[in-house]
Amino acid sequence: SIAELYDMQHEPDTRELLVCHSEEVGQEVGRAFQIPRTADDLRLKREAYFAWAQANCGMVGRSPDFLNVMLAALAAKKSFFAEDSAERANNVFEYYRFVARNDLFMTHALLDPQLDKGKLRNEQSDPAICLQVVDENENGIVLSGIKRIATAAPYADELLVWPFPPTFQR
């Protein structure tokens, strides 16, 4: 089960492999959150992923590490986000720290609904069905519409929603 994978991070036989200290977060975190700096860091990450895969016989398609790795990669490239906005770069990095600090399970919602698969999002008979920002105010953004394919949504702590694939271009 998912809980058993998290429990492995506290078991004496697997803790050292599955948990490491993160300078970015300032505490111990699950190995998937580690931003690797050496070949040995990468080797340990691979071994940690393999240990979780072995523990569930490879039968958990969306284990907690799958998006944690992606979030660590985004945090590692904070400079990329800073090219557009220092605030955005800080938000990405602080979100990584929040998720890592709390060892949260994330999933994602990727795709727009398609009423007609031969048409792009803006060409659909009802393009408003697709998730979109309809307002921005002091509290953040206001969304309307839907995204689909959120595989681990029933048991995830956090849901990442992003514009994938590009939906206004051919």
Residue ranges: model-predicted function:
Residues 76-144, 149:
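Gly/Pro-rich turn-and-neighbor structural signature
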Residues 146, 150-170:
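A short core secondary-structure module
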Residues 3-106, 152-153, 158:
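Internal helix-loop-helix
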Residues 1, 141-144, 170:
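Intrinsic structural disorder
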Residues 14-17, 111, 118-122, 155, ...:
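Generic alpha-helix signal with a bias toward terminal, lower-confidence helices
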Residues 20, 24-27, 117-122, 165:
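Charge-rich, low-complexity amphipathic helices
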Residues 19, 28, 128-132, 163-166:
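Short, surface-exposed linear patches
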